[in-house]
Amino acid sequence: MNFETVIGLEVHVELNTNSKIFSPTSAHFGNDQNANTNVIDWSFPGVLPVLNKGVVDAGIKAALALNMDIHKKMHFDRKNYFYPDNPKAYQISQFDEPIGYNGWIEVKLEDGTTKKIGIERAHLEEDAGKNTHGTDGYSYVDLNRQGVPLIEIVSEADMRSPEEAYAYLTALKEVIQYAGISDVKMEEGSMRVDANISLRPYGQEKFGTKTELKNLNSFSNVRKGLEYEVQRQAEILRSGGQIRQETRRYDEANKATILMRVKEGAADYRYFPEPDLPLFEISDEWIEEMRTELPEFPKERRARYVSDLGLSDYDASQLTANKVTSDFFEKAVALGGDAKQVSNWLQGEVAQFLNAEGKTLEQIELTPENLVEMIAIIEDGTISSKIAKKVFVHLAKNGGGAREYVEKAGMVQISDPAILIPIIHQVFADNEAAVADFKSGKRNADKAFTGFLMKATKGQANPQVALKLLAQELAKLKEN
């Protein structure tokens, strides 16, 4: 029997506000343990939450970017549970009326086709703290993350393969990053994914029993975990077994999912309206103000890069996959850089350098200005493409002007015939055996002179000019 895969994803995204959702403490990642806390985060008796307007701004932008309807009557709810990293014993979230609902996003699949994936809801909530377990036998609670604003985006169960889930996450990350509401860095926990997967016989409308997957710390692992689950569940069903409702984690080392706990039924969090936060309304004017702050999104940029700049679909997709890269490209082209040349450098040498150094484009000294200047001095013959690679590394590490560095470092190509011709004659004088071979008609004897000339000029001879002059002088040599 063949089965249809049914997948839904729950994605938690940390919003990049300066302060937390209900307290004025910093929401920045990476500070010392419990440095970003105050009495609200610690839930001292008598403290009251104060809603950060910037969080609602970000929620509205997310809803608009994901084609969602917006609940204009806003309120928060208490989600009750106890855990050491949650000192209040409840989480302030949204239950029956999320900020956004009934949305969708279009994803591009590997075969070039597109599919629209529904988004059930997007709700605002506070993050919990973090427990760490020391080698000394003690467990420690860090509340830096407590109260960091989150938006949880819950998809419809519209995905029918791990590939579609991967494409959905890729598209979602792009949209959230372009909207400017999160850096969506999975390695820092600012984007976290839980997956729900079930199988059902083809033609059956009723969903099968679902399994929840956690510990999915990369899009690649989401895909691998789902692929493993498809195989595991299909084998159980074909052998006459039943799928249990359970939570599993993906074990990257063993490339398998591991049981965490069996879920007997849905958890009862006893939601009720948050009494310490008043109801408020999101006006049409507020929504339109947020709409005007949204940028051009990846889909529109890709289309423009192809139609206006003449890039291929592949190049346009690669450039727009990351907003930082796309913005860099936009500025470089606006400065007069050739779109194809800038694209080639960003996807080639720049990408290789970033991978080797383990850095992002923002963390190096390369700027649109000095990249465009470097491309210009390649085009005008000041430096060769080979030398340009060395110049690029210097610019990436040290910044500064490309032309200024080339001139100071003595890297300018020699293009003047008045300089090159005497060097060619000296090459002939220094290599009498090669000259004799050439004059006697020995096959490929002329090729050796190219290497001699480049060596004599320490690689600084303009190849096009030098080869033309060399051919000219060799012809004269043969006549004599």
From Swiss-Prot:
What is the annotated quaternary arrangement, including any partners?
Heterotrimer of A, B and C subunits.
Report TM segments.
none
| PROSITE patterns reported in the protein's UniProt record | GATB (PS01234)
Q: Which family does it belong to?
A: Belongs to the GatB/GatE family. GatB subfamily.
Q: Which gene encodes it?
A: gatB
The alphabetized UniProt keywords are: ATP-binding, Ligase, Nucleotide-binding, Protein biosynthesis
**Per its record, how is this protein called by name?**
Aspartyl/glutamyl-tRNA(Asn/Gln) amidotransferase subunit B
**Which reaction(s) are listed as its catalytic activity?**
L-glutamyl-tRNA(Gln) + L-glutamine + ATP + H2O = L-glutaminyl-tRNA(Gln) + L-glutamate + ADP + phosphate + H(+); L-aspartyl-tRNA(Asn) + L-glutamine + ATP + H2O = L-asparaginyl-tRNA(Asn) + L-glutamate + ADP + phosphate + 2 H(+)
Origin organism lineage = Bacteria, Bacillati, Bacillota, Bacilli, Lactobacillales
Q: What is the role of the protein in this entry?
A: Allows the formation of correctly charged Asn-tRNA(Asn) or Gln-tRNA(Gln) through the transamidation of misacylated Asp-tRNA(Asn) or Glu-tRNA(Gln) in organisms which lack either or both of asparaginyl-tRNA or glutaminyl-tRNA synthetases. The reaction takes place in the presence of glutamine and ATP through an activated phospho-Asp-tRNA(Asn) or phospho-Glu-tRNA(Gln).
Give a GO biological-process term: translation
Q: What is its EC number?
A: 6.3.5.-
| Enzyme kind, highest EC tier | ligase
Q: What GO annotations for molecular function exist for this entry?
A: asparaginyl-tRNA synthase (glutamine-hydrolyzing) activity; ATP binding; glutaminyl-tRNA synthase (glutamine-hydrolyzing) activity
Q: Which HAMAP family match?
A: GatB
Among PANTHER family, the record links this protein to: GLUTAMYL-TRNA GLN AMIDOTRANSFERASE SUBUNIT B MITOCHONDRIAL AND PROKARYOTIC PET112-RELATED, GLUTAMYL-TRNA(GLN) AMIDOTRANSFERASE SUBUNIT B, MITOCHONDRIAL
InterPro entries referenced in this protein's UniProt entry, alphabetically: Asn/Gln-tRNA_amidoTrfase_suB/E (IPR017959), Asn/Gln-tRNA_Trfase_suB/E_cat (IPR006075), Asn/Gln_amidotransferase (IPR018027), Asn/Gln_tRNA_amidoTrase-B-like (IPR003789), GatB (IPR004413), GatB_C_1 (IPR042114), GatB_Yqey_C_2 (IPR023168), Gln-tRNA_amidoTrfase_suB_CS (IPR017958)
